[in-house]
Amino acid sequence: MGCAASKGDKSESHGRNEVSSWEPPNWDKEAGRLRDAIRGLGTDEISIVRVLARLTNRQRRKLLRVYKERFNEDLATVLETELRGAAKTVVDALLYTPEMYNVTSLKEAFESKDYDTVVSIIISSRNDSLMDMKEKYFAEFNKTLEDDLSKIPDKDVRHIVMSLLSVDRSSAKKRADKEAARIRATLLFNDGDILSLLCEKVGRNQLRETLAAFLELHRINIGQFIEEKCSTLSKKAQDTLKDCVLLIENPPQYFAKEMAKADELKILRMMVSRSEIDLYYIKKEFLSIYSRQLHDTIDKQCRFDYARLLIVILELRGQYSESAKKR
């Protein structure tokens, strides 16, 4: 096919997915709201999630510092003590940095042999995030991510994921070259090696332009093309390649389709991971594909203790102003 968690990490640098957002008028007031939700008559889980979800990841870290300064308590530790079950899982997800959340999710998926989730995390992550994840995975678990990826039972899928993980796009240009895209599209048509294209050291915009040129020049559905040219691969590997293409062409559509068949934990992971990127567009794609609202599906598809908290996140992070600034 070609192609050459520690809890302390909940307060480290957010990384590259920061989306500037609403600034609370009074940080002390936000810290006080959390304090009231925690110390009131019974822990108010909805209010805790509402305070955290209206903030970006970086703003949550500031709130952790303000809470410590005002009440002389470590908020993450307090929440760890006070929360149980779904609320603890959801709040943990909100407090992790994006890269550390992915690393933790990968480890949990490996332990439960949920290789579909492993593959989804790898193929949907930006190249710079993958590089960070590889470093953090080794630092956290004293083994390489590649070591655990070798456990993926489908050898074709394993090869695809390993190949994508080995690509360094740090020098890739952001602007697409249309003429180069047309030349590369013709080469793809002739050799049928979709994985080699996916593993080229070019940016996502160039890959998207190449796929668009492929359709324009050759009038062939890329999914059908993969089935024909990769017929010796397993069905799961073919589907993985199709997912890789969809993630280049239309990431929100990929996540909308994944959420439609996911349980509450997978929906949580995807919502939190995309909450500062394109959750707004995922909602729109979901409605377009399935003619129903995502929050209605969450309400029916997830256990109540998760659904009520996931809907809060969706309402707050799924607004245009919060998660529609990157396509």
Predicted regions and their residues:
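Long, charge-enriched amphipathic alpha-helical scaffolds and associated charged IDRs
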Residues: 1-327
